[in-house]
Each structure stands twice: as C-alpha cells, then as structure tokens.
Amino acid sequence: ASGKGCLLGHDNSGYYQAKKLQGEDNTECDLEPHELKLSPLEIEVTDADGFTNGLAPGVADSHQTQGTKECGLLTAHGNNGLAKSGALDQNPKLLMGVFTVASSNSALTVADLTKAATSAIANTGLGQAHAAVKAIQDANPAANDNTSTSEDTAELQTAIMHLELQAATAGSRNMKEETKKIFTNKVQDTITKVLHNVYSHQITVPFVNNGKDTPLRSIPNTGELMEILAFYEQKVADNTAKTQKELTEAQQAMKTDRSGDGGCTQITEPTACNSKPFCSYNESTTDDDKKCKYNATKATENGVPVAQTQTGGSETTTEK
C-alpha cells in the first residue's frame, strides 16, 4: 500500500543488524543514528529519582476509567474497548508500561515516573530511558552555567599557577587576583563559553575515525587524547619550521639581490609572486603593465628586512 514510508515490509522485518532496510513503496530506511545535537533544556526533566514532570498517580496508584470518564483505549473490554467484547487474559501495558489496563475492566494503573530510577517502579525500560535522558541532561554544557566557578575556585587557581605563572607553589602571590588578571570578563561566563567550544569542537586526525570530522567529546580515552595532542603539536612544529625556512630564504634573497627588490620584478606568475613574503602582484593596472613588485609593507609584516634600494619598482600598499 502507498504512503507507508519506512514501515518495514515482511521480507526484512527480522534483520535487526542491518544499517539500511527497504521499506514499503521502495523507500530506503536509514537505520544509522543521527548525531545528537545538544541544546539548552528549557526545563530540568529528570532528577536522581525519575522524571520530574511525569504523570503523578492518583489514590492507590490508579485513575478512574469507569462511568463518564471511560476511555476506549484504556478499557479492557466492552463495545469500544481493547478486546471489543469479553475479557482479556492479561493486563495490557501501554506506553512502555506507563499505563496498565486491568483485564477485569477495573481502575487503570499509572506508573510513577517520578520514581523511574528506583525499585518503586517495576519497569526496566523506563529505568533505562531515565538513565539515558539524565545522562544527556547532565552532559549538556549549555545547561550548566558554571556559576559556582569563580576566581575563588581552588582548582582554577592551581591551573593558573602551573600553566600561566609556571610556578609550583603560590608563594606570596594572591592567587585570587592573579586569576582575575587572566580573564577579561566574569570568570564563570568565560569558563562556560570555553567548555561549550571544547564540547562542540570537531577534529580531523588521520588515525581517528578514518580521518573524518569527529566531535572531540566523542573521544573519552585519555591515551587517545594524548596522541591527538601530540599530532597537533607536531603539526604546529612542522608549520613553524617551514615558515622559518621560507623567511630565512627570503632574507638571504634580499641580501644577495642587487636590484633591491628581492627579485620580485623577475616573477611573471601572480601566484608565485604573491607567495613571496615581500612581493605583491599588481592587479589594478592594465594587462600590459601588470607585474610583480616589491611590497615593503608586506615585507615588514612578515619579518623580512626592508630593501634599502628599489630599482625594479615597488608596491608599498598591502597585497592586492
């Protein structure tokens, strides 16, 4: 029948391990879970015991289903009940066991969701659901404003002492004031922003997730985190060495080039020209006059000594 979408067909209804299934009307159903995007929770939906906004049971953990309040879905039998007529052999459970309909057509039993994590509710599924939701709520950095973190926090002071001041002990330092110097805004506001950025940061490392973008928060193993840190440290070191080599070559070229422009006027390709830390390709002139020129401003910004003589033409503005 049309319109069923991802309702499973008979042929593949039992293959739970598949990542994709063929639904009705040739609809392909992707069973891979989507990445969870956390956002601030409007309300605190759980506490240590259960769901804070769960339906509260009535007297004797039951609600009335008789008389004018009768609901067909919550009634065992009758003209509009679950069984239409006659009685049921067992008490049907609805909504993962939140509602239990009495086979005898007596009062409806409602599970106490506020006790989902305790033995007061005999429903493993609801207990697991509570544990999962609470874990998400607790892990959500946007829901944690860290208002308890301040310049008086001992752990933060110790981190500042070791990392910023590079000291083993505070000595005569006022660590509260030293900590305040580090932050331009309120400490708790800055900490919240940093934690949120760390939590949402994506990394791309060859040996993690086959080089694909991966949320940093999804890597709980400390050893693997240390390997990632070492990878980025080596990457920074390589880039620094490359930059130093280019600057050394540029400085040497400036010393040996007699024209005083580092050889800029000898370069005809725009890309090759602009890649030099002291040359700029002039895009503003006519095609006949386009050429590579020495750029004193760019040379200064890149730490290259400014040429003393410039016989081949110069470009003193920023790179164009």
From Swiss-Prot:
* Membrane association type: Lipid-anchor; GPI-anchor
Q: Which residues are glycosylated?
A: N146, N282, N295
- Has keyword Transit peptide? no
Ranges of compositional bias, category Low complexity: 308-320
Claim: Lipoprotein is one of the keywords in the record: yes
- Which SUPFAM superfamilies is this protein grouped with? Variant surface glycoprotein (N-terminal domain)
Any one GO cellular component localisation term in the record: side of membrane
Checking Pfam families in the record gives: Trypan_glycop, Trypan_glycop_C
Task: Please name the InterPro entries in this protein's record.
Answer: Trypano_VSG_A_N_dom (IPR001812), Variant_surf_glycoprt_trypan_C (IPR019609)
Which controlled-vocabulary keywords does the entry list?
Cell membrane, Glycoprotein, GPI-anchor, Lipoprotein, Membrane, Trypanosomiasis
Principal cellular location given in the protein's record? membrane
Q: Name one GO biological process term.
A: symbiont-mediated evasion of host immune response
Where would you find this protein in the cell? Cell membrane
Residues annotated as region Disordered?
297-320
Functional summary from the UniProt entry? VSG forms a coat on the surface of the parasite. The trypanosome evades the immune response of the host by expressing a series of antigenically distinct VSGs from an estimated 1000 VSG genes.
Q: What is this protein called?
A: Variant surface glycoprotein ILTAT 1.2
What are the top taxonomic ranks of the organism?
Eukaryota, Discoba, Euglenozoa, Kinetoplastea, Metakinetoplastina
